């Protein structure tokens, strides 16, 4: 009888925990989906307005000054995606005012033509929302960390329209090698709910029709070579992002002046480039590359534009610029390797995303959700090669890699 009672108590504990998280995660997903959808629509409107009024580019220096003033006014200076990862790692508290700060700053960056994405900002908004919902629901420190992951999944899912990749990105990006699988069911719930909410807002998920060639040994070998190139480009991109930020902070101590000069530099670069392809997120360039058309120098120019924009204090994200760089590099390199240009662009996106984020499972899932499963083996090969060959560099310095990429060894290092 005692054994039966113990078994019953054991089962009820798991059922209660599951129900608690299903309800909590659904709440986070509902709010996160709504906020993420509004954020998506805001960035979309800012992009359309900038396209209709090209002269807004010349307001970029002023936008930079306003962003610095906004962050100082809300006392959120120095708080970014790394702080969200630290909140999961160490339970550090996130300021609630980070949400309006990154929301408005990203809109200003896109409105005036800074080269940035939105998913990095979404991770900050989602992580902050999740953590504060956890506190509102009187969760303890450990559960608040899972709530933070739920928020990250929800916002990523709402913006990207890739609910499975959103789940594993939140679980995978914090600590490479060990995943918080206790957060699997909560993150799936919040991600699916947020995705459903985004559809109700009329947000169309990112999907591309990419034809995959027949998978054979030669195709896989070509994909592996392309993945090696993606790994090298990801190292270059990460180095440019980090070194540009450190260099500008050292050369120009005043935050306002740094943002102002950064805006002026982006204007100068735009005039030199002779087009607006490298301002904003560049979604049309990604679509063109996946259609088989890209300038061979486009990936290098996007790296420079993004490094200057984010390094000088503008806000947004690095994920969509990563897709831009990956698609244009893949499209250009595919012609040299004998791969179909559009398919090579898809492989480039997969390889760059993996190399920049150190998240191979997420990269594989995102490729399937964006492009379909026809080229699954090629995407898997690209993820494997890019993950190993990109070394220990990454977008987020608070990301930890617990196990060596080269051997079965515990190393516990931060990305460079």
Language-model features: locations:
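Alpha-helical transmembrane segments and immediately membrane-proximal extracytoplasmic
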Residues: 1-416
């Amino acid at each position: 009888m005692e054994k039966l009672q113990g078994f019953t108590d054991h089962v009820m504990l798991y059922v209660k925990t599951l129900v608690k998280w299903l309800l909590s995660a659904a709440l986070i997903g509902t709010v996160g989906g709504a906020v993420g959808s509004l954020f998506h629509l805001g960035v979309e409107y800012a992009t359309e307005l900038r396209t209709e009024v090209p002269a807004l580019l010349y307001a970029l220096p002023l936008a930079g000054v306003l962003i610095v003033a906004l962050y100082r006014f809300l006392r959120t200076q120095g708080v970014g995606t790394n702080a969200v990862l630290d909140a999961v790692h160490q339970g550090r508290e996130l300021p609630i005012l980070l949400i309006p700060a990154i929301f408005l700053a990203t809109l200003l960056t896109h409105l005036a033509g800074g080269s940035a994405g939105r998913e990095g900002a979404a991770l900050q908004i989602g992580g902050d929302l999740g953590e504060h919902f956890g506190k509102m629901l009187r969760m303890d420190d450990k559960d608040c960390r899972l709530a933070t992951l739920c928020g990250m999944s929800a916002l990523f899912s709402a913006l990207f329209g890739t609910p499975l990749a959103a789940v594993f990105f939140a679980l995978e990006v914090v600590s490479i090698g060990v995943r918080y699988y206790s957060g699997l069911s909560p993150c799936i719930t919040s991600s699916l709910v947020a995705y459903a909410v985004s559809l109700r807002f009329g947000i169309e998920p990112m999907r591309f029709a990419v034809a995959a060639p027949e998978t054979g040994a030669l195709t896989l070998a070509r994909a592996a070579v392309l993945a090696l190139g993606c790994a090298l480009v990801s190292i270059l991109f990460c180095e440019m992002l980090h070194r540009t930020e450190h260099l500008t902070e050292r050369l120009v101590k005043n935050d306002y002046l740094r943002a102002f000069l950064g805006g002026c530099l982006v204007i100068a670069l735009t005039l030199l480039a002779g087009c607006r392809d490298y301002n904003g997120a560049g979604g049309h360039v990604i679509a063109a590359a996946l259609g088989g058309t890209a300038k061979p120098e486009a990936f290098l120019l996007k790296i420079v534009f993004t490094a200057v924009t984010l390094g000088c204090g503008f806000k947004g994200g690095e994920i969509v610029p990563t897709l831009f760089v990956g698609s244009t590099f893949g499209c250009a390199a595919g012609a040299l390797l004998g791969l179909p240009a559009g398919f090579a662009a898809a492989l480039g996106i997969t390889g760059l995303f993996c190399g920049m984020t150190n998240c191979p499972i997420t990269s594989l899932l995102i490729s399937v959700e964006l492009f379909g499963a026809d080229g699954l083996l090629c995407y898997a090969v690209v993820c494997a090669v890019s993950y190993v060959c990109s070394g220990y560099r990454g977008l987020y310095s608070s990301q930890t890699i617990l196990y060596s990429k080269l051997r079965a060894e515990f190393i516990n290092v931060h990305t460079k």
